[in-house]
């Protein structure tokens, strides 16, 4: 259902067209893009730990605020009824995604709602949060690796329980190229035409260090390189990188990390 048609107007349409024009200018504004990169370096992983300063509904989100804003836009436009997050941490992401789907459900834009989490370690304090937080009580979490068969079966079973599923995947677990590429290979086939996969922390490729976390990942071995490899596969050729999202954000932890399934 395109709810935008209910309240659309020539003025709103014109405003959205202007957004597209502004994004194009920002994308081609070398100085703006360079300032964004420099700011990320100052705020990044090993400097101020800036992303650790924000909460969603009282839970650490560990996200740049503008990245959350653009995810809200993706969710509103795509209207998924299943969201799967790989890498749970504190659970702030799960709270965010479930609250967004609760809004869609309340607005009668979706009739079913599921939010799933997968993490190699489902920590006790996170379990307590998810059990008691009003946005998280019906969230389901699987403890294990996102690329194990058991995790895949967990995702498949839950997706198949939804009528006409429209899953949105958020990959934010282990950030090595091989791991993320395997996640993409496993879960991309579930995504319908026009659907999205959000690959977090692609900024590691451009702002990370070769010895980060004991060289478990870094430039040349990152979520961004995983996307490049995946896009060369038969399944990957069905997707495109949503470059306009990176351009509009300027400051982002997921440059080139949003991929969209093409309509055939």
Regions found by a protein language model. Name each.
Residues 1-12, 80, 178, 245:
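Intrinsic structural disorder
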Residues 2-36:
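N-terminal auxiliary segments of SAM/dcSAM-dependent transferases
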Residues 17, 21-24, 34-41, 131-132, ...:
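Polar/charged alpha-helical tracts
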Residues 19-26, 30, 39, 46-47, ...:
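Short, flexible helical or helix-coil boundary motifs
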Residues 29-40, 187, 197:
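Short, solvent-exposed beta-strand-terminating loops
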Residues 55-59, 66-264:
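S-adenosylmethionine/decaboxylated-SAM
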């Amino acid at each position: 259902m395109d709810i935008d048609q209910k309240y659309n107007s020539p003025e709103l349409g014109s405003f959205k067209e202007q957004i597209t024009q502004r994004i194009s200018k920002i994308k081609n504004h070398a100085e703006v893009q360079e300032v964004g990169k420099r700011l990320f370096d100052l705020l990044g992983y090993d400097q101020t730990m800036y992303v650790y300063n924000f909460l969603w509904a009282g839970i650490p989100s560990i996200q740049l605020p503008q990245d959350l804003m653009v995810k809200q836009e993706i969710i509103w436009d795509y209207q998924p009824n299943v969201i799967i997050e790989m890498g749970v941490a504190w659970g702030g992401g799960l709270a965010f995604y479930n609250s967004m789907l609760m809004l869609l459900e309340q607005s009668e834009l979706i009739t079913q709602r599921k939010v799933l989490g997968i993490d190699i370690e489902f920590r006790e304090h996170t379990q307590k949060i998810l059990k008691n937080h009003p946005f998280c009580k019906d969230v389901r979490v699987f403890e294990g690796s996102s690329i194990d068969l058991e995790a895949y079966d967990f995702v498949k079973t839950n997706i198949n329980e939804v009528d006409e599923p429209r899953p949105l995947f958020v990959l934010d677990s282990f950030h090595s190229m091989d791991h993320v590429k395997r996640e993409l290979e496993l879960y991309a086939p579930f995504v319908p035409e026009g659907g999205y996969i959000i690959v977090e922390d692609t900024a590691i490729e451009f702002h990370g260090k070769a010895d980060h976390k004991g060289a478990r990942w870094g430039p040349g071995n990152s979520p961004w390189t995983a996307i490049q490899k995946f896009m060369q596969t038969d399944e990957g050729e069905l997707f495109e990188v949503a470059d306009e999202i990176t351009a509009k954000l300027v400051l982002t932890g997921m440059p080139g990390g949003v991929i969209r399934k093409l309509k055939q």
